[in-house]
C-alpha cells in the first residue's frame, strides 16, 4: 500500500538522493529553505511503500498575477528499486497526484505543474497523459533538457575529449598573466556578479533574477558550503562570472554572465573550467551545464549559442518529458493563454 507523508527531517530527505542519477538542487532541502525565504509556502512530500521511502516531491505554492498554482520543479523523484506493487510508476504518480489535488484545492490553486526528470519516451508520456496531465505552454523556469559531463576522469582526460578550440582557449587563458579567476563566498563579490547579470539582461532584453533571488539562493546554500561565486578578472576588472552549486555529487552551472566588451579574451572558458575542477575537488561525479537546446536544429533559439559553448567541454545531452500541467478549475485557461503568448514573444 502506498501512503503520502510530509518529510520533516533534512537528513532523510538528502540521503534519498544519494543514489539518484537524474536530479537537481531544485528538489534539495535547501531549495525548499530558499523558497521559504522568498515567501513561498512549501510542502515536502514523501511516498512510502510500507516503511520504504520511494518518492519525494518538493512542492511550492506560486502566487502570480496570472493565477495561483502548485509547482514541482524537476520532480517528483522516484527511487529506482524493486517495488512490490504492479504498474508502480503510474500508481506512485496517482497517489501523489491525489494529495496534490487536495493541497491545491485548499490553497486556491488553479492548476498543478510538474517537471519530473523522466526520460522523454512513450511509456512516461503515456503515464502522465492517462493521469490527466497535459503539456504546459512553457517550461517551469527550469530546463527540460540539459548537457552533462562525467567528471570522474582526470583533468588531462577531460581536456583531451573537449572540442579543440575549447581546449586551446582554456590553456591560453590559463597562461595569460592579465587574467585571473576568483572563487568567492563573499556577498560583495556576489554584488559584482549581479551587476554583470544586469548588463547581460539589458543587452539581450530579458528580465534577470533579482538581487534578492540571487542573494537568498547564495546564502541558503552557503550555510552548507555548497555554493561558490566565480569571477573572471582582466587586469583586476571583473568581466565574467558564474554561480555554481555543488549538491549531491553534482556541480551545477546554474547562472553565468559576462561583459561583451571583453568577449575576445574568452575568459568565460577559464571560469567554467575552474568550476569543473572545483567540482572534481569536491568529489562530484557529474557536472550539469544547466540547459540544452539542439543548436543545429534550433539555431535562432536564445539558448543555441550558450549550448554550443557548453558542448565544447565534452559531455552528453539528457532529454526529459516536457513540463506537465494538471488543471484544477477553469481559471487555468487564463494562465494557459498568457503563457502561450509569452512563449511566442520570447521565441522559445
Protein language model regions, located:
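A conserved beta-strand-loop-helix scaffold within acyl/acetyltransferase catalytic domains
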Residues: 5-50, 56-66, 116-121, 133-140, ...
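Active-site/acyl-donor-binding loops of N-acyltransferases
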Residues: 6, 10, 20, 131-155, ...
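Glycine-/proline-rich flexible loop or hinge segments
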Residues: 67-80, 107-113
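A cross-family glycoside hydrolase active-site/sugar-binding cleft signature
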Residues: 73, 113-115, 254, 290
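Short histidine/acidic/glycine/proline-rich micro-motifs that form metal-
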Residues: 77-78, 118-119, 293-297
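Short, basic, low-complexity termini and linkers enriched in Ser/Thr/Gly/Pro
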Residues: 78-98, 128-129, 178-182
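Non-catalytic accessory segments adjacent to catalytic cores
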Residues: 93-146
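Aromatic (often tryptophan-rich) hydrophobic motifs at membrane interfaces
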Residues: 95-99, 103, 216-329
